[in-house]
Regions:
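Active-site-proximal or metal-binding-adjacent scaffold patches in catalytic folds
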Residues: 1-197, 206-243
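Walker B catalytic acidic pair
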Residues: 202
Length: 243
C-alpha cells in the first residue's frame, strides 16, 4: 500500500502490476475507498510519474466523490441499531436474547430482528449476525428473483438453464452463452423496480448477447424506464454493499 498527497489530501494507493495490461490505468475502489493503479509489467518509473501528474485533476475529482459515497454508506458493527437495506427500505437491527442456540431472523415493520442465545459472546455474536443476515438476504433474493424471472418470462418466452446466486463486487447479473443466468444476491437490498430491471436485462441477453438497439428495444417492452433505473444503479450501487 502506498499513498499520494493531492491538494493536502492523503490518497491511499494500491499498485497492481499486470502482465496483461497494455497501458497505465487508474480506478477508484469505492468500497474502501482507495485508488488502484494498474501498471503494465515493463512500465518505467518516469512514465508512471508523468501519468499520475496528468491524471491529478481526475484523481482529485473522483476521490472526493468516493469519500462522499463512503460517508453515506451504512456503518455496521453487528450490533443493535445497525441499519440494513431491504427492497430499498431501511431496517434497523434489533437483537433479541433467546434460549435457542440457533439464530433466528425476521422483518417486523421497520426492524430486522435477530434472536441470539443469551449466552453468546460478543465476538461470536458478531459472526452470527453477519452470517445470519447474509443467509437471509441470499434466501430472499433467490425466492424473489426466481419469481420475477417466471413473471417476466411469461412475456418473453425465452429458454434458460441454470440460475445461480453469488456475492460479486461489481456485477449485478450475467448471462452466459450456455444460457445460464447469474445474479448478485445483494440485489435484495435494492428497490423491487431495480431487481426487475436486472432480471429483464439478463433475460433479454438470452436473445441478444450484446447491448445493441434491438437489445434495448426488447428490454423496453417490459421496462420502458430502463434508462432511469440504470442511472439509479450507477448513482447508488455503493449503498448495496454488505461487509
Amino acid at each position: 500500500m502506498e499513498e499520494l498527497v493531492i491538494n493536502h489530501q492523503r490518497v491511499p494507493v494500491t499498485v497492481r502490476r499486470s502482465a496483461r495490461a497494455r497501458r497505465l490505468r487508474l480506478q477508484i475502489e469505492s468500497d474502501k475507498p482507495e485508488l488502484v493503479l494498474v501498471i503494465p509489467r515493463y512500465a518505467l518509473s518516469m512514465q508512471i510519474d508523468s501519468f499520475i501528474r496528468k491524471q491529478t485533476p481526475w484523481i482529485e475529482k473522483h476521490w472526493n466523490q468516493a469519500l462522499k459515497k463512503a460517508a453515506k454508506r451504512p456503518k455496521r458493527n453487528q450490533k443493535d441499531g445497525d441499519t440494513y437495506f431491504y427492497f430499498g427500505e431501511t431496517l434497523t437491527l434489533k437483537l433479541i436474547p433467546s434460549l435457542s442456540w440457533k439464530p433466528g431472523i425476521r422483518v417486523d415493520g421497520n426492524n430486522l430482528e435477530i434472536t441470539l442465545h443469551q449466552a453468546t459472546s460478543l465476538s461470536d455474536g458478531k459472526k452470527a449476525i453477519k452470517k445470519t443476515v447474509q443467509g437471509f438476504y441470499k434466501k430472499k433474493a433467490e425466492e424473489v428473483i426466481h419469481d420475477r424471472l417466471q413473471f417476466f418470462n411469461e412475456h418473453y418466452g425465452l429458454k434458460y438453464n441454470r440460475v445461480t446466486f453469488r456475492n460479486q463486487k461489481t456485477r449485478w447479473g450475467s448471462c452466459s452463452s450456455a444460457k445460464n443466468l447469474n445474479f448478485n444476491w445483494r440485489l435484495i437490498m435494492a428497490p423491487i423496480e431495480i431487481i426487475d430491471y436486472v432480471v429483464v436485462h439478463e433475460l433479454c441477453h438470452l436473445k441478444h448477447m450484446n447491448h445493441s438497439a434491438d437489445f434495448w428495444k426488447l428490454v423496453a417492452e417490459t421496462i420502458p424506464n430502463h434508462k432511469e433505473l440504470r442511472k439509479w444503479m450507477k448513482d447508488n450501487h455503493y449503498l448495496l454493499s454488505y461487509t
